[in-house]
Amino acid sequence: MNVSETDTDGDGNRGPLAGVSVVEMTAHRAGPFCGALLADMGAEVVKIERPGAGDPARSQGVGPDGKSGYFMANNRNKKSVTLDLKSEAGVEAARSLLEAADVFVENFGYGVTDKLGIGYEDLRQRNPDIVYASIKGYGESGPYKEKPGLDMILQAEGGIMSVTGPEGGQPVKVGQAIGDLTTGMFAAMGTLARLYEGERAGEDEEFVGKFDVGLFDSIVTLMNEYLTEYSMDGSVPGPQGTSHQTLVPYQRFETADGALVTGVPSDDRWGDFVELLGREELAEYPTNDDRQEHAEKVVEIIEAEFETESTEHWLDSLTEYGFPCGPINDVEGVVEHEQTAARDLTIPHEDPEWGECLLPGHPIDFAGYEPEIREPAPRLGEHTEDVFEDVAGDQTTLEEWTAGGAFGSD
């Protein structure tokens, strides 16, 4: 498939993935987030769900108004179709849809798609150019490949929980589902890499479009330098609190009316920081090595000074001196932040059923492309008829699929 030659309806504002067709068979968050990122960039994403029930995320986090922000945020810009994959007709309809797709994203348990007849080897017989993204708890190899995995479990097992929490305290989970979200990002990254590889492959070259990524893989990858440092000196860090593992100071500080985060990124700025605070005794610690050695004393002096004035006062002063700094915002503070609006990180949306809401924007600012919500989070099976009328190609096939229970029973 040559993406550059696909039909974009003459609209140059449809995004860098305009013309790319994605079929998504995923649930909860990691897979749907991958699909949402691809959809934000212009891909057409068709989400296949179970008749009657759909993605379990539809019923998670539902408030008294019946809205599930969890589902809405991760399924924007998608179409929803329902297929009963327990019926042969449903599987055949899925195969027909996948035969014309550029990308397939799935997060079934290990081996399930092979049993259904929609595994990679099955699909590439019909569609040799397909990119196949498989998302699992532990990936598709290794002794844990068949074990189910959820975000918090993988945060614990992958190590990130061990370095999160108050210093000297018990490990805690990160406040967001970081395993799911980073896995979704890595899956989107892998998809783009395979699409690019497929574009470059010559006619005589065999293209292998499959890749897999696990939540365990993503979390372990986030351990980053901790892995290398352990291999070098055997160090095993505990919960880090808000302080940095190597820079002093670089952490959360209380102020007279709140808190902020700031740090001194290099020794040549230390004199300016001492001047800003007006605490000359800090000049005794000109290097980061000095400050690490006497970290408790250094931080105690800085904390005492920050507590004398308001957060706004210190942020203004730190900004004037050119030091990185910021307040500790809750979700309201983030939504109301002027930079959030300037970067289109939340997009106002009028949902046809649920009314006004904000949906997450895309973090990459593509020149020449304005982010938009082309489709609200779809109602279950909202696009089944339209999508499969096109896929079937004729009324007889569509009627056979329907009679065979492809779309579930009424």
Language model: regions and residue ranges:
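N-terminal helix-loop segment corresponding to the beta1-alpha1 unit
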Residues: 1-206, 379, 385-410
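Oxidoreductase and adenylate-handling cofactor-binding alpha/beta cores
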Residues: 184-209, 221, 225-231, 274-280
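Glycine-rich beta-alpha junction loops
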Residues: 52, 138-139, 215-222, 257-259, ...
